[in-house]
Every structure is written in C-alpha cells, then in structure tokens.
C-alpha cells in the first residue's frame, strides 16, 4: 500500500471497475491522495503490481497518489467523502457493508446509474435505507466514458445534492483535475432518473443500427427517447430542464452514438440477431440497461406514463420479441402530435 495513506485523503472511491478506476485516476492525477477500493483482494493486488487497470484501461498508469485497498474499513475511515461506483444491483449491499465503518462526518456521493432491481426505487431511497437519513448524499451523473476520462480528455458532468455545501466541495475537488468540469444541479430526482432511462434508449439505438437502419432512425429514437425520459421524470417530480442537461440529453446522445457504450453494443448485437444471453456474454461486463429496462418499464406502468420505445425494448429483452418486429410495431403506431 502506498505511503500516501498517511496523508490527508481527498476521497475514497468504492468500486474498482472501469468507471470507478477512471474517476480515481482523474481525481489523483494532480496530486490529490485518493483511495480506490475493490472487494476482490486478488484484483486489487494485481492493480498494485501493475499500477494500472490493464483489464479495463490498458496503458493508463496510476498516479503516485492513487492508493489501492481491499480493506473496506480502512478505505471508509480514511476519508470524509466516499464516491460509490458499483453496479446498481449491488449498490444497496455495498452501502450496507459500508455503514458500520462510517465516520460521524461521512458524506456519500455515487456515480452509479440505474434503479434498484425489482423495486425500481431511486438510489437515494436505497441509500437512506442502508446508511440512514442523516448522512449527506449526492449523485454525480453525465456523459462520461471511462477510457476518455482516464486519459485526461475534457469531460463535463453534473452533481446534485440537497446539501449545498457538499455540492460545492465536490465541485472543488473534482475541478482540481483541470480537464473535468462539474456543473451543479438542484434536481436530485431528475439527476438519478436520467442515467437509468438513457441506458434503455441506448439499447434501442444499438438495435436500430444493428438491424441496419440509418442515422435518421437513430436520431428519431434519441429524440423520442428524450421525450419518454421527460414524461417519466415529470411523473416522478423531476424538472424538465434537467433532461436538457448533462444527466439527460448529454448522457443520452453519448451512449446512443458511440460504441464505447456497453448498452449500445448490447443493442447492436441484438439487432444483428444474437440472443439476449449471447449478447451479454459478448460484452463481458455489466450491461446496466438490461436491468434498467425492466425497472423503467415497471415505473412507466405504475405511473401511467406512455413510453412506447421502452416498452418495445422490454418486450425484446424479457418476452423474446424479435428486434425487427419491435421496430415494425413502433413505426406502425397511430399518428400523433409531437
């Protein structure tokens, strides 16, 4: 373990996958002491040997001030601020494990995008259940690909929290990376919802391209997908303006148009005729949109929100519908006002 652990720790990042690693690298790039925690001790030991995450971010060396650990108690106790970057289906479990080690002044931000499996709850509700209502919470969301962030390419994102001081501190800490710009946003609900819905629409955009449709179809899916995001957001109490920003339109365009997106690549495979299981195997990493689709469609039904694109994607993923048939049914819908 790096001796910098004896110095002040700016932040602890919980989750040593591609995105968690890239965020830790970005935070530590200009000298800030950052802990990157992972649950797999062997994986963390290999990262320490390589001083890089060769599996997910090959060729990107870790800054000296990046500290690796598989010791959850040490990682949580070392820093006031925790940044959780784990898949949505284990988000609550990780926070439950974190709770016994929290400091009196601990604050938790997450960059996880999605909803709680089975319940469809926003992650804020999951976090409160796991650690209590007294711990300050924040969400970081927006258009970010791990490889570009780790390479130091310019990136912009947004952060939201009911705690204004926490937002200001997060902006200050993340801005230290010089190429990572962070906007503040007061819409805590919309900031959480956007990342889940865009995953679903990105699968649809990939399916469209996999079938062989062109840019016209992809753009129509993005535009009408944004409308679905706004309608569901309104039903849950979010602000429409949020979905015109980083956590909505920004993230949606990014993941629908670039093959760095796992959700888009998953959709491409489905559009090319592969089964759901084979498409997931081909990706080789968590495809958040697969689970998100089920939860987003359940929310749409619960709140009576019309989301035809999400419905068709749900039918492809969970009811065995062919991607071409889904596209045909979308195009055959009754004419309506935009």
UniProtKB/Swiss-Prot annotation:
Sn-glycerol 3-phosphate binds at residues 113, 142, 144, 198, 251, 261-263. It is an enzyme of class 1 (oxidoreductase). Pfam families: NAD_Gly3P_dh_C, NAD_Gly3P_dh_N. Signal peptide: none annotated. One of its GO terms (molecular function) is glycerol-3-phosphate dehydrogenase [NAD(P)+] activity. One of its GO terms (biological process) is glycerophospholipid biosynthetic process. GO terms for cellular component: cytosol. Disulfide bonds: none annotated. PROSITE patterns: NAD_G3PDH. It is found in: Cytoplasm. The active site is at 198 (proton acceptor). NADPH binds at residues 18-19, 39, 113, 146, 262, 286, 288. Keywords: Cytoplasm, Lipid biosynthesis, Lipid metabolism, NAD, NADP, Nucleotide-binding, Oxidoreductase, Phospholipid biosynthesis, Phospholipid metabolism. Coiled coil: none annotated. It catalyses: sn-glycerol 3-phosphate + NAD(+) = dihydroxyacetone phosphate + NADH + H(+); sn-glycerol 3-phosphate + NADP(+) = dihydroxyacetone phosphate + NADPH + H(+). InterPro entries: 6-PGluconate_DH-like_C_sf, 6PGD_dom2, G3P_DH_NAD-dep, G3P_DH_NAD-dep_C, G3P_DH_NAD-dep_N, NAD(P)-bd_dom_sf. Its EC number is 1.1.1.94. Pathway: Membrane lipid metabolism; glycerophospholipid metabolism. NCBIfam families: PRK00094.1-1, PRK00094.1-2, PRK00094.1-4. Belongs to the NAD-dependent glycerol-3-phosphate dehydrogenase family. HAMAP family: NAD_Glyc3P_dehydrog. Catalyzes the reduction of the glycolytic intermediate dihydroxyacetone phosphate (DHAP) to sn-glycerol 3-phosphate (G3P), the key precursor for phospholipid synthesis. This is Glycerol-3-phosphate dehydrogenase [NAD(P)+].
